Amino acid sequence: MQNIIAKVIEREGGDKLTKDPSDPGGTTKYGISQRANPDVDVENLTLQQAIDIYKEKYWHPSRAVDFPKHLMDMYFDMCVNFGQFKAVKIVQEAVNHKSKNTLKVDGRIGPKTLAAVQNLELNRLKSFRVTHYAKICMANKKLMKYYYGWFRRTMHI
């Protein structure tokens, strides 16, 4: 868990404070955005506070620990980037693409999803993640400037 959280923080730019007006998350530090965490003083956030937020808000609820080792980092990164509900839906869609719609795409981690992900290939999940980014950019052209970075982030996991 600690190692995966550290990787996410690194991918998110570490302690660099960003205030990009076109970023839907608003002010961000350690990957913790003001919009997703309105009760947090993001500008004065410490590394330990960020780690604690990742553990409580993302790691434990995501059940990433129940994913196969080869998918754990990718899945957790998706939960941070998209939110758990959307991340799970993307995982379920990737599973269904290969298994002919055996899972209900409901954004919930249940026993069927956990069993099905055991056979999901990392590259298949990467392709569904990149496709989701493309859909985001098609819906909001202003976010296109982030696409290459999102693509690169996905491919390096």
Spans of model-derived segments:
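Cell-wall polysaccharide-cleaving catalytic domain and substrate-binding groove, primarily
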Residues: M1-I157
